[in-house]
Amino acid sequence: SGAAVAAGLVTCALGTDTGGSVRGPAHNSGIVGLKPTFGRVSRHGVIPLSWSLDHVGPMTRTVKDCILLLNAIEGYDDTDPYSVSMDPINIDINGNFDLHGKTIGIFTAFTEDILSKDVEINIQRVLDSFKSLGVNIIEIGLDQLSKSEAQQGPILYDIIVGPESAAYHYTNMEENIDSYGNHPRRRLE
C-alpha cells in the first residue's frame, strides 16, 4: 500500500499498525503515515493481529491528505468494543494555524544506541524549525526505566501479540492451514 501511494497509483491507503506496519512503509517510501490514538479509528472488519495493539491508520503523499483521510475515518463506532468517543482532530488544512506556545515532547531515552547520525541531524533540523515557530521542546526520558528494562519491549510485544493472534487464528488454522503463507504460519504456530 505504501509503495502504491508513493508511486501515485492511489491517492491514499489504509493500513493496520501493530508494530509499525503503517509507519514503516511510510518511512521507507517517503510518504506520510499516521498511527492514530488507540480507539480513534474503528477496527470493525479488520482481521486482528493483536486486538489490544492494532490501530488503523492512513497513508498519503501529503500531510494535508493525511488530515483529510483521518477526519473521514475517525469517530466512535459501537461495533468496535475498543472504539472511544473523542473530539475530532480539527486542523486547518491550509496551514493557517499558530504553533507558538505549543509543546512537543521528544523521547530521548536510549536513542543514542539506535539512531544513525543522519537521523539525529534531521531530527535536530525539525526541532529547530519548530523552535523557530515558537514551539516549546521538552525532552522526555524514562529515568526510572533501566536500559535493560527498555530492551525488554520487543519481548513484551511478543508476549502480547503471540497469544492474541494465535487465539484469533486458531480455528481457521486448524481447518485451513494451507491458506496461510509460510511466514504467517511460522509466526502463529
Regions found by a protein language model. Give the residues of each.
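Active-site-proximal alpha-helical scaffold in enzymes
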Residues: 1-27, 59-63, 67-70
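A short helix-breaking turn/cap at a secondary-structure junction
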Residues: 35-121, 175-176
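Short connector loops at secondary-structure junctions
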Residues: 105, 135-157
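Conserved active-site and cofactor/substrate-binding residues in soluble primary-metabolism enzymes
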Residues: 16, 26-29, 61-68, 99, ...
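Glycine/threonine-rich beta-strand-loop-alpha-helix active-site module
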Residues: 18-44
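Short helix-loop capping/hinge segments that flank enzyme active sites or metal/cofactor-binding pockets
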Residues: 98-107, 159-189
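Acyltransferase
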Residues: 91, 117-143, 169-175
